[in-house]
Amino acid sequence: MAIKIGINGFGRIGRLVLRVALGRKDIEVVAVNDPFIAPDYAAYMFKYDSTHGRYKGEVTASGDDLVIDGHKIKVFQERDPANIPWGKSGVDYVIESTGVFTKLEGAQKHIDAGAKKVIITAPSADAPMFVVGVNEDKYTPDLKIISNASCTTNCLAPLAKVVNDTFGIEEGLMTTVHSITATQKTVDGPSHKDWRGGRTASGNIIPSSTGAAKAVGKVIPELNGKLTGMSLRVPTTDVSVVDLTVRLKKAASYEEIAQAIKKASEGPLKGVLGYTEDAVVSTDFLGSSYSSIFDEKAGILLSPTFVKLISWYDNEYGYSTRVVDLLEHVAKASA
């Protein structure tokens, strides 16, 4: 039986989750909710994408429906998740991708509206976080609301797991050089919580905070308190890169570290962690479905216990693919 899902929030992640889900035979997208997007506009936004290109199938709007390749998807425009008719529509799982309802209290409204389970596509202050390839095996069916963590945590955690499992991490610092996201400004504007974040996105390198490294401690308890990090927002539309600098417990050569990562990418983390020895740049990873692609040529080792590792990620498409993977895992575990 198909996994019946609804998507709340038809932004960058919501639309790409839909693209990915349409390619999975075991998933049926029943409905989309976004208070700011009517069916005809939803069709336009789904069909045309400045970053990932035009959708190759047929996309139209018909009444209250978004129609993709003949498949009808209900479009609701409710501001309050409690009012979305998930139950009446037969939706079992909700992908919460507004970026607003990231806590248990807000996400619970989807359950109240008839959904059985919710996956939040953002870090959560109180919902359990899962990263595919790292700790999804810890999921238990009694959990109704979970978080897929952030795109950066999804990039960092698989890399940190391999390094920690093989050599041990004493402590580390992470910097993500991160593409523009929707929260940034096209020109200088007010941003009271983050003054730098209010500066023109297209013309600046903007230092910012991120909880991605600390969140790794939630999905790999052994690393709790051992990692922290920051973000540099740069004027690219998509694809980001993690710079992880760590002190190792066990001495190793750079070649040994790279080989351990390569082995994991071909084994237990296949499809999640990638590996490349090519002379790549950011656009080479547009549309990549990996969470993290280790760049063997870009890292450096200062001493046998002090190393910098570089890993790329499509912060939109790779993350959206993992959301759908986590959904399938949850559905299977809950069956």
Curated annotation (Swiss-Prot):
GO BP: cell wall organization; glucose metabolic process; glycolytic process
Q: What is its EC number?
A: 1.2.1.12
Q: Name one Pfam family in it.
A: Gp_dh_N
Give GO MF terms, alphabetically. glyceraldehyde-3-phosphate dehydrogenase (NAD+) (phosphorylating) activity; NAD binding; NADP binding
Reactions this protein catalyses? D-glyceraldehyde 3-phosphate + phosphate + NAD(+) = (2R)-3-phospho-glyceroyl phosphate + NADH + H(+)
Q: Which domain of life is it from?
A: Eukaryota
Q: Which residues cross the membrane?
A: none
Q: Give the SMART domains listed for this entry.
A: Gp_dh_N
Gene Ontology CC terms, in alphabetical order: cytosol; extracellular region
Tell me the keywords, alphabetical order.
Answer: Cell wall, Cell wall biogenesis/degradation, Cytoplasm, Glycolysis, NAD, Oxidoreductase, Secreted
- The site (Activates thiol group during catalysis) lies at 178
Any idea where this protein resides? Cytoplasm; Secreted, Cell wall
Which InterPro entries did the record assign? GlycerAld/Erythrose_P_DH (IPR020831), GlycerAld_3-P_DH_AS (IPR020830), GlycerAld_3-P_DH_cat (IPR020829), GlycerAld_3-P_DH_NAD(P)-bd (IPR020828), Glyceraldehyde-3-P_DH_1 (IPR006424), NAD(P)-bd_dom_sf (IPR036291)
Q: Name the pathway.
A: Carbohydrate degradation; glycolysis; pyruvate from D-glyceraldehyde 3-phosphate: step 1/5
List the active site. Answer: 151
Positions bound to NAD(+): 12-13, 34, 79, 315
Q: What is its main location?
A: cytoplasm
Please list the residues that bind D-glyceraldehyde 3-phosphate: 150-152, 181, 210-211, 233
PANTHER family, alphabetized: GLYCERALDEHYDE 3-PHOSPHATE DEHYDROGENASE (PTHR10836), GLYCERALDEHYDE-3-PHOSPHATE DEHYDROGENASE-RELATED (PTHR10836:SF76)
Q: Subunit structure, briefly?
A: Homotetramer.
The UniProt entry, under NCBIfam families, shows: GAPDH-I (TIGR01534)
**Protein family membership:** Belongs to the glyceraldehyde-3-phosphate dehydrogenase family.
- Its name, as the record gives it, is Glyceraldehyde-3-phosphate dehydrogenase
Q: What is the organism field in this record?
A: Candida albicans (strain WO-1) (Yeast)
